Amino acid sequence: MDFLYAAELKKKFVCFGHFYELVLMNGARMKCRSVLEIVDAALVPETPSAISLMKPDVVVIMMNPGSSHPKDIYHLDDEFEYPRANGSLRKQLVLTQPDNTQYQVMRVAVSKGWNHIRVLNLSDLRDPKSGSFLQKAGELAGVMGGHTHSIFCAERAEECSHSIQRSANTPIMLGWGQDPGLIPLAEQCMRRIGGEPTRTVASDVHPVLNAHPSPLLQAKKLQWLETMIQELDA
């Protein structure tokens, strides 16, 4: 298959994210992103936040938002506590610089003819370093309400149910990687989406882990793409 580079993909797709600051009962604040909406540039509505209420062509679940950030350097994050008093499912979306891993998702979308991809994560915590991220996630497990950094927790069931709806019965793509530290979050995710069709590039490390979509070597990136597309076509 043709390997489209980031410069080409940026012309075809626009990315919008919902960024927020998770406020915990102990006063701690965590920088988060709850969703990334990848949309064909020709189909972006006049009010981008309306995208959050649309059904995408496909949903992808990855590890965490990585280095993704708002393009507007002056953007102020919403403050969230869970459970939320205002249960609106509409999210304030802003133009977003995606993490490099998302370009792999865009390549799959081009191959499949998809125009709207919704990316969720096992955790909303924004951290580009997986070791640091896993340490934070582990620490939050011991904090009252700390587990709500994951959209797959019980308190966010309605938000999750809405977010995984697709316009067609496409499988949910899974690509959060093979770090054993992810197993608790991955198991929670699989319980929450139980019964939904899924596709992944399998890992031999653990049944709930899978190959990372964007390994360092381009040959490995191509291998992941080809395998995922084969799985989706199966």
Where are these regions (language model features)?
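Short, well-ordered beta-to-alpha junction loops that form the rim of enzyme active sites
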Residues: 62-63, 122, 175-179
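Active-site and ligand/interface coordination hotspots across diverse enzymes
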Residues: 1-91, 233-234
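Acidic, metal/cofactor-coordinating or nucleic-acid-engaging core segments within structured domains
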Residues: 88-100, 106-120
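Short connector loops at secondary-structure junctions
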Residues: 114-134
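Conserved acidic residues
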Residues: 57, 115, 168-172
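A short acidic, glycine-rich active-site loop
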Residues: 85-99, 143-155
